[in-house]
Structures are given as structure tokens and as C-alpha cells.
Design a protein with these regions (language model features):
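A conserved beta-strand-loop-helix scaffold within acyl/acetyltransferase catalytic domains
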Residues: 10-43, 49-61, 179, 184-268
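Acyl-donor binding region in acyl/amide transferases
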Residues: 64-140, 256-315
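Hydrophobic/basic alpha-helical segments enriched in Actinobacteria
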Residues: 33-34, 48, 59-64, 84-85, ...
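Acyltransferase donor/substrate-recognition loop-hinge adjacent to the catalytic core
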Residues: 4, 127-203
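Short hydrophobic/aromatic beta-strand or adjacent loop that forms the aromatic wall/cage
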Residues: 35, 146-150, 319-325
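Active-site-proximal cofactor/substrate-binding loop regions of enzyme domains
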Residues: 329
């Protein structure tokens, strides 16, 4: 019979023996600070499923009535179902009215499951999971809360004909674009962090993130930064928009030529909405990628809304879909 353990401190993760499921790294616990971590072990003591729990936060950082389930991994449907039952019991006992997952504490960290794989191989920093994991959640009574997609533009010669006009209009308004200054990387990220808090405030399940945690989330990217692919839009030294492109390092890892850029994130300050700044950032980033020899762009992990679908239609075709789940806790 499987046994469940509650772990409240990252140092205790080292006590979990090796098994079919890899234990959570202590660094992941420290970065996302869950309220508890659940480990399911078989009769031989091997880890067969794990997850972490949080109370969701609102846009002001205050706790809500939703509980989050993240850091999810399970050997099979039986182990996953048993683990999720324990997780739901914990959230129910804590007074949560619904559960959402998978989400590693907030939308600033890993969340959602890959649910439509397509034929394109996994790209750099893309969340991946076994194809049966979505069924673990639906079998436990979860239903889709939101869907997301990644789109591929395989023709970087296509440019937005409105860009030149928009550039003139924005420059007339005092807004100019430049590449990131790698010599001031932390200071540049601090400005991106501050602007992101405003730009993403209306996003689904948004909650604020501290600067230190934000900087830490960019640690995997820093060694691979290509300054020409990170564009900042400013007026009078104030950041009003950005786009963050990175090379798809999975391609050389597979022995293939590096030919794809990934648009990791893009945002425009709410005061600049409707000016065409987002479109100009996107177009200039793709032009820069083509100039550097890239042949394709992946627009990664966009929330499936009418606006994002129009962006996909203009710049490429959908190659992957992802789902975030929820269920009520009666």
C-alpha cells in the first residue's frame, strides 16, 4: 500500500529515495515556496508521485479561496489519482473552494500541461509532460480552465507593412526602440519586472512576484542571451514595452542547425495600448532574427483569446496546445 508524506522544508527532500519519479529539486522548492510538498511512495519506499500545494494569490498578493497544485509528476494514472486525492483533501481541509493545476505557485513559474503535441519537437524552455498526465487530472474531476498555444512562423521574410508608419508615429510621441544592454542586465531586468507587474495585472490568475524571484527565473536564460533579440521601447528613459527572444537551444542539442528563435515574452504598458507598439516590437524582433540567420520563429505559450488567435493567424500556424485545469471542492 502506498504511503503519503508531507514535506514542509526543502532540506527534507533529500531523504526521499530514488524511484520511478525524480524527487523535486530543493532549488525548485525554494524558488516557488509551496506551503507543503506531498510525496507518494510505494511499499518499497520508492517515489511514485509528487506535487506541491499553494494558496492562490490575487492581483494584490492577498490569498484567495483557490488552492494550487504544482510540481506534479506521477508514474501512472493510479499513482496520480491517489496523489491528487490527497492534494484535494489537503486543500479542502484548508478551506479552499476550488483547486487549480498544474501550476507551480503562480503564472510566473511553470504551469499547464501539454495536451496537443503535434509534430514539432520540443523547443527550449517549453514545458513537457507524458501524454497521459492530462487524463490524471480529468479522471480526478478536473475540467479545462484555460487553453494556450504556441505558433510557428516559418517565413521570416514576411513583414508587417504597417511597421514603418507606426515607427514614425511612435517616435513622434517620443517612443523609441533599442536592444537590451547586457552590461546592465540586472538593471534592465528590474525595469522589465516593474513594467510587467502593470502589463500583466489583468491576466488570468495574475499575482505579483518579487524582484529577487523574477531575477532568479531568468537565470537559465542569461548565458544564452542574444542582445539583438531583446528589444525595449522607452520614452524619456521609462520602459513602455519589451519583447524577449531567445534561440531554440534544443536544435543544436539534437545535432541540428540553430534556425529557430523563440519569443519568450512580450508586453506593452497599459498606457500605450492601441498604439501598435506590440506589433512593431514583434516585427522588429523577427527582422533582427532573420538578419542573424534565423529562419523560423515560435511564438510560445500564448493564452488562447481572440487577440492571440489574430496574432497567430498573422505570424504563423499553431503547433502545440496546452491546458490548465480546475475543479470545485464541495
Amino acid at each position: 500500500m502506498a504511503t503519503i508524506s508531507d514535506i514542509d522544508h526543502p532540506d527534507d527532500l533529500s531523504s526521499l529515495p530514488a524511484g520511478p519519479v525524480e524527487p523535486l529539486e530543493p532549488a525548485g522548492f525554494r524558488l516557488t515556496t509551496p506551503s507543503r510538498h506531498l510525496a507518494l511512495q510505494d511499499p518499497a519506499g520508492r517515489l511514485i508521485a509528487r506535487c506541491s500545494l499553494w494558496r492562490a494569490r490575487d492581483a494584490r498578493g492577498a490569498p484567495t479561496t483557490a488552492g494550487l497544485i504544482g510540481h506534479y509528476a506521477a508514474l501512472d494514472a493510479d499513482a496520480g489519482g491517489e496523489l491528487l486525492a490527497h492534494a484535494l483533501d489537503r486543500h479542502r481541509a484548508d478551506g479552499c473552494e476550488r483547486a487549480i493545476g498544474p501550476m507551480d505557485g503562480s503564472t510566473w513559474h511553470r504551469y499547464r500541461l501539454l495536451t496537443e503535441r503535434g509534430t514539432e519537437p520540443t523547443f527550449f524552455l517549453e514545458p513537457d509532460n507524458p501524454d497521459d498526465w492530462p487524463r490524471h487530472f480529468t479522471d480526478a474531476g478536473f475540467a479545462p480552465l484555460a487553453t494556450y498555444f504556441s505558433a510557428l512562423n516559418a517565413d521570416l521574410s514576411r513583414c508587417d507593412p504597417r511597421s514603418d508608419t507606426r515607427r514614425v508615429e511612435l517616435e513622434r510621441d517620443g517612443i523609441t526602440l533599442r536592444t537590451i544592454d547586457v552590461g546592465r542586465f540586472d538593471a534592465e531586468l528590474a525595469a522589465i519586472h516593474e513594467m510587467s507587474l502593470a502589463a500583466f495585472a489583468d491576466n488570468l490568475l495574475y499575482s505579483p512576484i518579487g524582484l529577487d524571484a523574477f531575477l532568479a527565473s531568468y537565470t537559465p536564460i542569461r548565458p544564452h542571451l542574444v542582445p539583438e533579440l531583446v528589444l525595449l521601447a522607452e520614452r524619456g528613459g521609462r520602459l513602455l514595452g519589451f519583447i524577449f527572444g531567445i534561440p531554440d537551444l534544443m536544435e543544436p542539442g539534437r545535432g541540428e542547425p540553430l534556425r529557430t528563435m523563440i519569443v519568450k515574452s512580450m508586453a506593452v504598458h497599459p498606457t500605450c495600448g492601441g498604439k501598435g507598439l506590440g506589433g512593431l516590437l514583434m516585427d522588429d524582433c523577427q527582422r533582427a532574427a532573420r538578419k542573424l540567420g534565423f529562419e523560423r520563429t515560435i511564438h510560445a505559450l500564448m493564452h488562447e483569446t481572440n487577440r492571440s488567435r489574430s496574432i497567430s493567424a498573422r505570424y504563423g500556424t499553431t503547433i502545440r496546445r496546452y491546458t490548465l485545469y480546475e475543479r470545485a471542492l464541495p
